[in-house]
């Protein structure tokens, strides 16, 4: 890899927010307990959505749709006027409907309460529970209006799955076996949902950027083609500049993780 490459410093630097497992589409995330109530920054709220989604055993697309809904809401409404954690619970509940992965509202309320208030007992069926339930139902209608009832997203997942299968056939079997290219690509995609760019970026380009950055992480070059053009075989319309932009944003996510999340860790 040329010394002037903009992402050379990432070689041999694995993702820091996740522990990669055999299930590539569902990486095992950092289990550090976070005191979310100390921050209302969107990055932290997305981290909260992802933790709650995993505890609800929601599927990958549901969690990513919930994150996308929050980004879309944040782009149109002032977060200072709304409780971000009420809206994140609402995003999860609505995302379950959008992706046909229905989440019981009672489960959403209980999980959100337990993650926000880790030292408290589960929320009893009293006034606080029913008030929270009513608030989420009303917030769901508000969220739909803010999003102009456009709540479906073209996620990069199907593109990434296709590109990884193609790349596996392209590369030497021993390289694919030795390095967790697929798992790292999936992890980077999931982590990119901390950034609102994922809502507006071309999903094919996002998928290719995650794959390219995973290759660079392990210092791997695709054979029989220039290392910086292999993705054009997959999608000829992809812009190199856009690829670099997305790869840079992925790395910024990992920088923000230590800045915003680690500082909120419960000791």
Task: Indicate where each model-derived feature is located.
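Structured all-alpha helical bundle cores of eukaryotic regulatory proteins
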Residues: 39-208, 212-241
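C-terminal functional regions that serve as terminal interaction/effector modules
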Residues: 1-20, 200, 205-267
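A eukaryotic "domain-start" boundary segment
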Residues: 1-61
């Amino acid at each position: 890899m040329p010394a002037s490459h903009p992402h050379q410093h990432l070689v041999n630097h694995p993702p820091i927010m996740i522990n990669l497992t055999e299930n590539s589409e569902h990486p095992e995330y950092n289990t550090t307990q976070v005191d979310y109530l100390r921050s209302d920054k969107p990055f932290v709220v997305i981290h909260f959505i992802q933790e709650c989604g995993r505890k609800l055993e929601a599927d990958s697309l549901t969690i990513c749709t919930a994150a996308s809904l929050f980004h879309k809401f944040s782009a149109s409404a002032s977060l200072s006027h709304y409780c971000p954690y009420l809206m994140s619970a609402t995003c999860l509940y609505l995302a379950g409907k959008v992706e046909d992965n229905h989440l019981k509202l009672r489960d959403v309320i209980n999980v959100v309460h337990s993650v926000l208030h880790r030292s408290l007992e589960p929320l009893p069926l009293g006034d606080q529970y029913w008030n929270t339930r009513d608030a989420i139902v009303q917030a769901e209608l508000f969220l739909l209006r803010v999003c102009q009832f456009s709540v479906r997203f073209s996620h990069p997942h199907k593109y990434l799955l296709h590109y990884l299968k193609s790349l596996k056939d392209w590369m030497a079997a021993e390289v694919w076996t030795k390095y967790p290219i697929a798992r790292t690509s999936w992890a980077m995609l999931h982590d990119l949902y901390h950034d609102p760019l994922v809502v507006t970026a071309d999903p094919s380009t996002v998928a290719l950027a995650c794959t390219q950055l995973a290759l660079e992480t392990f210092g791997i070059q695709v054979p029989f083609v220039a290392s910086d053009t292999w993705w054009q075989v997959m999608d000829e319309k992809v812009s190199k500049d856009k690829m670099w932009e997305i790869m840079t944003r992925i790395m910024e996510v990992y920088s923000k993780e230590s800045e915003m999340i680690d500082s909120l860790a419960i000791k």
